[in-house]
């Protein structure tokens, strides 16, 4: 998988559907507490393409969003 891009967002405001257009169940948006953690795969939690919350470890006010496909 490749990291396409990252943006810093507010957890409370959810996703920008224009930024992340998920085309299949194989795509995940994974949230990280900082960019270095994103590079090394230390995920905080993730949503699958149906919006189901998975692997909840922490809730942070800000995070980096990376799209994998």
UniProtKB/Swiss-Prot annotation:
This is Uncharacterized protein 322R. It comes from Invertebrate iridescent virus 6.
């Amino acid at each position: 998988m490749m990291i396409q891009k990252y943006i810093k967002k507010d957890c409370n405001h959810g996703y920008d559907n224009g930024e992340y257009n998920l085309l299949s169940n194989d795509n995940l948006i994974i949230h990280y507490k900082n960019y270095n953690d994103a590079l090394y795969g230390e995920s905080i939690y993730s949503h699958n393409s149906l919006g189901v919350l998975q692997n909840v470890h922490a809730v942070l006010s800000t995070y980096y969003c990376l799209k994998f496909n």
